[in-house]
Amino acid sequence: MTRRYWNINLEEMMEAGVHFGHGTRKWNPKMAPYISAKRKGIHITNLTRTARFLSEACDLVFDAASRGKQFLIVGTKNKEADSVAWAAIRARCHYVNKKWLGGMLTNWSTTETRLHKFRDLRTEQKTGGLNRLPKRDAAMLKRQLSHLQTYLGGIKYMTGLPDIVIIVDQHEEYTPLQECITLGIPTICLIDTNCDPDLADISIPSNDYSISSIRLILNKLVFAICEGRSGYIRNS
């Protein structure tokens, strides 16, 4: 895998608050190598380490995108939901930004059945088929469609398991992370000072509570994916 320059700037990361960790009482001792200091009761992440792992992650997604691989971005906390959707849409990735439905990956056949149902209902709605049904039936199917749109809208074009999963918050998204580990799907995970750096394939030490921090990390990854995709399209 070729190493590239991704314009990862320490000053820019400081401005985004990437270096702010959790309180010193809420930490995982495994994160000690990634912590540079304590300040006013919170741990400070070593941004040199963050830059290194973010660069490795960018290299990985660029290489994968240049070979036509598929990505899934997961982040279901309310405040990060819009950033996750925006990043995924920009990079033409699949995403989950609401509740993670248990077994979404490990029980893929069930997810696939739900996706077929979702697509059928969307087609029925677009062609006016739902309006030709009795009111009670139409209302029930519209509620079903709304539910599927909420939870599966970001993966509606997914036809198989993703090749790489990007996880925004290890604590919040522990279930999808475990599903990826079970299936052997490579993961890139943003980890704060209370996380386990050994679980993901590439762990990026960063502030997972700050929107500006999350956006900066996602922006770098999205740029790398887009660059890789453009090369894949040119060579196709």
From Swiss-Prot:
Coiled coil where?
none
The record's keywords, sorted A to Z, are:
Chloroplast, Plastid, Ribonucleoprotein, Ribosomal protein
Where, per UniProt, does this protein localize?
Plastid, Chloroplast
The protein's matches in InterPro entries, at most eight in alphabetical order, are given as: Ribosomal_uS2 (IPR001865), Ribosomal_uS2_bac/mit/plastid (IPR005706), Ribosomal_uS2_CS (IPR018130), Ribosomal_uS2_flav_dom_sf (IPR023591)
GO molecular function of the protein, one example? structural constituent of ribosome
One cellular component GO annotation, for this chain's record?
A: mitochondrial small ribosomal subunit
The name on file for this protein is: Small ribosomal subunit protein uS2c
Source species, domain of life: Eukaryota
The biological processes this protein is annotated with in GO are: translation
In the record, the note on similarity to other proteins reads: Belongs to the universal ribosomal protein uS2 family.
**PANTHER family named in the record:** 30S RIBOSOMAL PROTEIN S2 PROKARYOTIC AND ORGANELLAR (PTHR12534), SMALL RIBOSOMAL SUBUNIT PROTEIN US2M (PTHR12534:SF0)
Pfam families hit by this protein:
Ribosomal_S2
